[in-house]
Design a protein with these regions (language model features):
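P-loop NTPase catalytic core of nucleic-acid-dependent motor ATPases
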Residues: 21-46, 92-210, 279-281, 312-315, ...
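Long, basic/Gly/Ser/Thr-rich N-terminal segments
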Residues: 35, 42-100
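Loop/turn-to-beta-strand initiation segments
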Residues: 210-213, 253-257
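Positively charged interface segments
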Residues: 29, 61, 65, 72, ...
Length: 421
């Protein structure tokens, strides 16, 4: 029996080694991946079984299971080293600190799970793409540059800038057209489409593992009661990923998130830290079928190989711009949209913005029965919102509007007051 077991063990190992050599397999986070056309892709039980069936058509279930276990053990890796190389269809791009771009051949030694659906061609251009951007952003060069930076951030295998993107515009403002183009650019297999409020559900975040992008062209109006996971994903913090019928694991998401919308989502229940993690891109143009330049085939025109290569060149330009500027451009349109978003989501800001006379902040005490906090609390109650506590109320007004606090005597009593810096 021992001889037979040893013999079978050798067969299992031989089969496992053949699989490993033929497919360059790795086993990470309870998942197998095989190297194909320059990138590691999921390699499941069905593919192992198909291989065994071809070479051992009469193999029993135990044989298949043992080979699978041998493969997992031999292919196991603990983690993947971060690389700054960008995986595209015709090689691996390296963007140097001085802005030079080099194209290296693909290699199974560079473990990469995502490949952009574009060939690098530094001379590639696409007039249809140029015109579409010009139309969508009303010819604003800074808005187009911000779009390029967002594309450049997609190329980065990290989340150091800690930003998520809201694409805001009325219906028929090309948000879906651009979303379709960006999905194709990233590669459909590298994109998820999980709604904001679904991310926090038990298995919701499992769908973003190894994705370049999570994009939803038009999110439903939703209220988020907890934003901790959202902030962790955007900020590159480790999150616990639960998978159905598999072991949970800690994961750092290096992909990016884009959400298209007509109306802002409601973060008011947990708004702390949201504003600094957002970049808002405003889509200006509303398209009508009667417009002289209306193009019903725009999605196809923006999905050609030329369009993808031209978009890659824009992304490379945006990549360099991000590094040079040490962050994203703050355009005038983005600032306006951010102010509207904050006003909708921060009850303290909304209350201050609603005041007919902002000077009242310096004339009235913060606390007390007729104080500013009481007026704010009353407004929240009438709107059916939960008021922030007085400490947070005071801190927000101080940091956002440039006030300090000091105690003053009013009618014989000491009260805290806001004073200008």
């Amino acid at each position: 029996d021992d001889v037979e077991s040893r013999g079978l063990g050798d067969v299992y190992k031989r089969q496992a080694n053949e699989l490993l050599e033929q497919h360059h397999l790795i086993y990470l986070n309870s998942n197998l991946y095989a190297y194909q056309n320059g990138v590691y892709r999921p390699f499941g039980k069905d593919q192992i079984n198909a291989y065994i069936s071809k070479h051992y058509p009469f193999a029993k279930i135990r044989f298949r299971q043992e080979v699978a276990e041998q493969v997992k053990g031999a292919a196991y890796i603990d983690q993947v080293e971060e690389t700054s190389l960008i995986n595209v269809k015709n090689g691996l791009l390296e963007i140097g600190e001085n802005g030079t771009v080099k194209l290296h051949p693909h290699s199974p030694d560079i473990i990469s799970f995502r490949q952009f659906n574009a060939n690098y061609d530094p001379l590639a251009s696409c007039p249809v793409l140029d015109q579409a951007l010009d139309n969508a952003f009303s010819g604003s060069s800074e808005q187009i540059e911000l779009f390029n930076q967002i594309m450049g951030y997609l190329l980065m295998n990290h989340t150091r800038y800690q930003k998520c993107f809201f694409w805001v515009g009325l219906p028929s403002s090309a948000k879906s057209t651009f979303s379709t183009m960006v999905r194709r650019f990233c590669g459909e297999e590298n994109v998820s489409s999980i709604e904001l409020d679904d991310l926090g559900k038990r298995f919701g975040a499992a769908g973003i593992v190894n994705k370049t992008l999570n994009i939803v062209p038009d999110i439903k109006k939703t209220k988020l009661f907890a934003s901790g996971l959202f902030k962790a994903l955007v900020g590159g913090d480790a999150v616990r990923i639960e998978q159905k019928y598999r072991e949970a694991f800690d994961y750092v998401f290096t992909g990016k998130m884009i959400f298209g919308m007509n109306l802002f989502p409601d973060f008011s229940a947990d708004f702390e830290g949201i504003e600094r993690r957002l970049v808002i891109l405003k889509f200006e143009r509303v398209y009508k079928p009667t417009d002289p330049d209306f193009n019903p085939g725009i999605d196809d025109d923006l999905s050609t190989n030329e369009a993808m290569s031209a978009l890659l060149n824009r992304a490379i330009s945006g990549y360099k711009s991000l590094i040079q500027n040490k962050g994203f451009l703050e355009t005038q349109k983005s600032k306006q949209q951010m102010a509207a978003f904050v006003s909708e989501n921060d009850s303290v800001v909304a209350w201050v913005e609603s005041l007919d006379d902002a000077g009242i902040l310096e004339r009235e005490p913060i606390s007390g029965p007729d104080g500013l906090y009481k007026a704010y609390e009353t407004r929240c109650n009438s709107a059916g919102e939960k008021a922030k506590d007085q400490k947070d109320f005071t801190r927000i007004i101080k940091t956002r509007y440039g006030y300090e606090t000091a105690r003053k005597r009013i009618n014989g009593k000491q009260y805290p007051m806001f004073i200008k810096n």
